[in-house]
């Protein structure tokens, strides 16, 4: 992992823990300070943000720099790349689509993309794309696939490595196609649907796929092994698989929403709840 990916991964993982009790705010801050120092030193992380929920109250802690060159500190407004935590939003969109009757997880991919008829991937159920059990799709869409036409040609010609539903293999190409089809079922572009419908329904005003120009100053850099400032590379199905950017405040709210701690509209709350159903 380069540092931008590691920073997003570690930050997001820490978001998922909920502290149930603390003797005092000072004790809590000291515990978080210690953890932040440990992680930042061990992994050479330039900046981090923590969100913790105790008895329904959110606590935020910020460390280091979002931009080393400009010396911009991490704050509640800092926008981080979430990496593969983005997949939870793709799943939310799919669950929302199913609740609205435009998609069924037991449908096959070719129902939504007729071009894929009579191909292994076309005959694959959406639930298998969602659970990485579609027969061994690779981690990434190949680099030489540059547009939607080439993307569909790639899927049309792809051959399974092992039988569908026999193994799970983590794959951006699998969950990415799942997200793509979910938006297609609602006759919408994935990015547009996510930014105009799903994220507003979740009450996450500072979460984006495309960071707006007036928010770019808040957009944190990652740093590679050479110390160069970098951001996520664009690619096919990047929005669906790893393209979400968000703040600690929004992500702590998302965590609370998944635990049923904040009021949401019925459909979006049900979509979140459905995401936690196990498929075996």
What are the language-model segments listed below?
Residues 5-16:
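Bacterial N-terminal signal peptides
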Residues 19-21:
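Boundary at the C-terminal end of the N-terminal hydrophobic targeting segment
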Residues 25-80, 102-107, 111, 147-159:
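Short, conserved catalytic-motif segment at the N-terminal edge
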Residues 60-63, 67, 119-280:
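Short, surface-exposed loop or secondary-structure junction motifs
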Residues 90:
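Active/ligand-binding-proximal structured segments within catalytic/core domains
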Residues 104-119, 201-202:
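Short, glycine/proline-biased beta-turn/loop segments that scaffold the active-site neighborhood
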């Amino acid at each position: 992992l380069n540092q931008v990916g590691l920073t997003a991964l570690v930050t997001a993982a820490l978001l998922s823990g909920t502290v149930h009790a603390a003797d005092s705010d000072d004790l809590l801050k000291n515990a978080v300070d210690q953890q932040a120092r440990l992680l930042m030193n061990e992994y050479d992380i330039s900046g981090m943000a923590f969100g913790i929920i105790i008895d329904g109250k959110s606590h935020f802690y910020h460390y280091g720099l979002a931009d080393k060159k400009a010396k911009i500190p991490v704050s509640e407004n800092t926008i981080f790349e979430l990496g593969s935590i983005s997949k939870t939003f793709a799943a939310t969109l799919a669950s929302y689509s199913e609740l609205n009757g435009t998609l069924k997880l037991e449908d096959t991919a070719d129902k939504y993309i007729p071009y894929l008829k009579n191909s292994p991937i076309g005959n694959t159920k959406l639930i298998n794309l969602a659970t990485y059990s579609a027969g061994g799709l690779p981690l990434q869409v190949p680099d030489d696939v540059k547009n939607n036409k080439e993307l569909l040609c790639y899927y049309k010609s792809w051959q399974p490595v092992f039988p569908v539903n026999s193994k799970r293999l983590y794959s951006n190409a699998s969950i990415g196609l799942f997200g793509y089809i979910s938006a297609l079922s609602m006759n919408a572009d994935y990015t547009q649907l996510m930014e105009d419908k799903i994220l507003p329904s979740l009450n996450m005003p500072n979460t984006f796929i495309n960071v707006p120009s007036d928010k770019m100053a808040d957009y944190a850099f990652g740093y590679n092994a050479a110390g160069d400032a970098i951001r996520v590379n664009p690619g096919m199905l990047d929005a669906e698989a790893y393209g979400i950017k968000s703040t600690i405040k929004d992500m702590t709210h998302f965590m609370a929403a998944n635990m049923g701690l904040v009021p949401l509209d019925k459909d979006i709350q049900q979509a979140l709840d459905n995401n936690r159903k196990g498929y075996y």
